[in-house]
Amino acid sequence: VFFQYAPFDVEGGLKFWGHYTSEDLLDWKYEGTALYPDSSYDCHGVYSGSSLIDQDKMHLFFTGNVKIDGDYDYINEGRETSTLHVESEDGIHFSDKEEVISFEKYPEDFTCHIRDPKVWKENDRYKMVLGGRLKEDKGAVLVYESEDLRDWKLERVITTPEVFGYMWEC
């Protein structure tokens, strides 16, 4: 089980991913911190995401958060969130982080708030959904597709005619 946590701030500061394992779902072993905010893509937090086992490898997809210093609202400008990926053969040691969807490639009608990738395999292709906030303060889901877990193409955006929350996430 991976979980998002802020080990240095009880009010939810800098986010990391912790990791527990279990053989029987009754007894759990803490494996330590799996993902750190240690790259230029996620220096202000490793936000939530999902894992996928495919071809004997574990793939983690998550949101990297970067806040630019300055006088910004951090809704429409001043924040860069990218979808990041690592893989592992043992679930403990992970590859270097790679950016699979950069913040510049998200649709222009969205704010800086796009996050929390959920990835699965469907009919020999991979699907991803991300929660987002439209500039009109309306929540939406972005649906992506990939053949290789690295090159993602936007398929569609899902929302409701009426406002049903200003941000859809997790």
Model-inferred region functions:
Residues V1-D116, W120-C170:
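Beta-rich carbohydrate-recognition and catalytic domains
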